[in-house]
């Protein structure tokens, strides 16, 4: 059964009502001025805001990045006016009334974008795509649990913060939210409190046009503590009481199901029109008259409303001072752990982190995933910032280091005997790829550099997580994603598991570094680069063994994104090899070398290559000062290679269920076949140089391919 909180008494009910009413009027004024925005839920949630920022949250308006602050995440990010207005009321210096009025304006420097953005004060993560924020919140809660279990000592609870997340009806319809809710309950994250703005209205009408399940029962089934509050658009005291119960809960996260009214008090209350529309001048005037306000006054907050929050900056200063004093004493009492903690607060890895990594590259044939495995294991074993995990494919990806401890609810007893606690740094995410990467974003956002999240699964399944990876790029958050079993060499599992189109998507995402190394030397260089970059990276790795290129491939050169693997003076043709398919490119180049001066290039990361000087890029692609026929050989689609090559020998259909050694033959990845096609192309370009500008597809589709049956 859910806990239903009876109405609580409060001596401040009258003042609460004034704040709620003036807050609603301010929302309407702000939205009205530019004729757009999302007023409804911001109006309906005003009582929740008072309960949070007046009575519950630990925060410091003068130091919004205070390390041990409670984190608040607005998962239903379109309700951002709710958050901005309370930032203004509680005294966040940057959130002036002028800034509030810049919402939906053409002001380039507005701090009030249409959805909250991480670069602004007191915003923990960028939200907007529904379901992301609650997943990020699970990551933030994991971060807190792990830091507390790692560093807290008797008498020195230096990490005590909680995570509060507000969600709406639509958030709870999204897949990643449900994945994260399930995992949070399984982990027993009792430091996570979710407030559900339950107004039962969506864009197209009432929520029951699409959803009729019992949300509280769903959370209960996922091992959440559930508290229900009626009249949550008005009753501040009862929400505060619910939050107190939630804070006291041990062993489970808490959902506070707050029954609210969208557009409260206005003509469009309880109607979908309140979601994303201005009310209109007559409607705003009507609400102000109803509330006993001067309808001519716009953007007005009376002094007594400001006074209600006036102690919050001083309270925050005291909180910060006391915490800093506690940390100073901790550092004296535990100098080794203390210095390590301070370094992590600064976002620093151990200064000697590179020395943890293996120094010897593989000499024999080996999958590129094997090299990445050794690197992750070495870094994870020696660096507490690393928190790795996998989407139920640890047996294939195999990143666990010797002595690894799992991040798990310590009370959990599994049938297979696996156990752990909150100091563990390896997470079994289950088949929840989207949540995994969104949770990694939360870990990365806790405090930049305090955690280095590393996720892993088959490369194909990062497609499930693409929205979360995009959000990492948007927020400039750093995680390393280990995608194994890439290209068609994934093999017998067939085209459902062969990610022929995925690299094009991830290469297109700003601030995401897609890396596909050809051998262990490149893996070593690119993994090191991924650790150094301030952005997220995806290492796309082979299932099968690949050739090594000693004396030719280079860890250092790979960090520049592209280089000449094997040179030929005054080359007549160039072959770009990528990942596991470099073997075919390299061997085809040897055959071509009998007739043409042939150069072999490796371009494992186009984004890194694009960041090099134009002089360097020309020295690789046009070493002889002229464009020569350049053919890329890749086991994925050619889309995007037009910038670097003049023709492709790439996948132009989906894959097929065949063993790796057979599937390449089936799709024509044969050195002799490739050499024959490239030779014909070179001779055609000699006859018609304009072909160099047409980016031709040199690979034929298999005769038995489904496409050719149409």
UniProtKB/Swiss-Prot annotation:
Tree of life domain: Eukaryota
CDD domains xref list: TPP_PYR_DXS_TK_like (cd07033), TPP_TK (cd02012)
Pfam families (alphabetical): Transket_pyr, Transketolase_C_1, Transketolase_N
Cofactor requirements of the protein: Mg(2+); Ca(2+); Mn(2+); Co(2+)
Motif (Microbody targeting signal) on chain: 708-710
Cofactor note (record): Binds 1 Mg(2+) ion per subunit. Can also utilize other divalent metal cations, such as Ca(2+), Mn(2+) and Co(2+). Binds 1 thiamine pyrophosphate per subunit.
Residue numbers binding Mg(2+): 169, 199, 201
Marked site (Important for catalytic activity) residue numbers: 38, 275
Transmembrane feature ranges: none
GO MF entries: formaldehyde transketolase activity; metal ion binding; transketolase activity
SMART domains: Transket_pyr
Statement: the UniProt record of this protein carries the keyword Protease: no
Reaction equations catalysed: D-xylulose 5-phosphate + formaldehyde = dihydroxyacetone + D-glyceraldehyde 3-phosphate
Biological process per Gene Ontology, one example term: methanol metabolic process
Family: Belongs to the transketolase family.
Function in brief: This is the major methanol assimilatory enzyme from the methylotrophic Hansenula polymorpha.
The name this protein goes by in its record: Dihydroxyacetone synthase
Taxonomic path: Eukaryota, Fungi, Dikarya, Ascomycota, Saccharomycotina
The encoding gene: DAS
